[in-house]
Amino acid sequence: MAKRSKAYEAAVAKIEADKVYAPIEAITLAKDTNPSKFDATVEVAFRLGVDPRKADQMVRGTVNLPHGTGKTARVLVFATGDKAEAAIAAGADFVGSDDLIEKIAAGWTDFDAAVATPDLMGKVGRLGKVLGPRNLMPNPKTGTVTPDVTKAVNDIKGGKIDFRVDKHSNLHFIIGKVSFDVNKLAENYAAALEEVLRLKPSASKGRYIQKATVATTFGPGITVDPNVTKVLVDA
């Protein structure tokens, strides 16, 4: 196991190992214990009481973070004609059809989100083995298979993120940067938590959110009380 840096060990020392923190406390502590000199990402992870191998327990959706993630997403749009022009005008980073499909089929995935017009999904669907594992496959349930490419690009650029529970029953969200005000991070956290709770599968029995953790990119995890659904921000 790699030896932790002195900065990391100092950060860990500020955290009470067995304490479950209120969200605002955890976020404040995450900022305070960030061991990196750069503007690190603040992330939250939820461990869910679901079995993602079962279709009726899959948790997948989108959330519009009120303050964005602090990162401008690179958006790819599969479109032609007027829709392609609209995507370019909206600020999409990559726009095309057959050319992009061939490039991705060869292994290229240097983008953060993908949108497709419905007429191209027959071709785009063949990229499932490349895009699926990376959660990049356009999906009508997340608003990324749509004729309204302008809205889709604007939503993603504005802080809309897709999420899907992984095979270990975990969900991961970026809720901002260390440079964000604590209140903005707390409001982003609250938006993510609210959507996860809304999407609880009826087939999920017992405790739904089993654990919640907040951490910076290279910082220690801080356990958050998932039962606190209303995040009180600092005045």
UniProtKB/Swiss-Prot annotation:
- Keywords tagged on the record: Repressor, Ribonucleoprotein, Ribosomal protein, RNA-binding, rRNA-binding, Translation regulation, tRNA-binding
Tell me the PROSITE patterns matching this sequence: RIBOSOMAL_L1 (PS01199)
Please provide, alphabetically and separated by semicolons, the GO molecular function terms listed in this UniProt record.
Answer: rRNA binding; structural constituent of ribosome; tRNA binding
Which CDD domains does the UniProt record give?
Ribosomal_L1 (cd00403)
**One example of a Gene Ontology biological process annotation:** translation
Homology family: Belongs to the universal ribosomal protein uL1 family.
What does the UniProt function comment say about this protein?
Binds directly to 23S rRNA. The L1 stalk is quite mobile in the ribosome, and is involved in E site tRNA release.
Assembly and partners are described as: Part of the 50S ribosomal subunit.
| Name of the protein in question | Large ribosomal subunit protein uL1
What organism is the protein native to?
Answer: Paenarthrobacter aurescens (strain TC1)
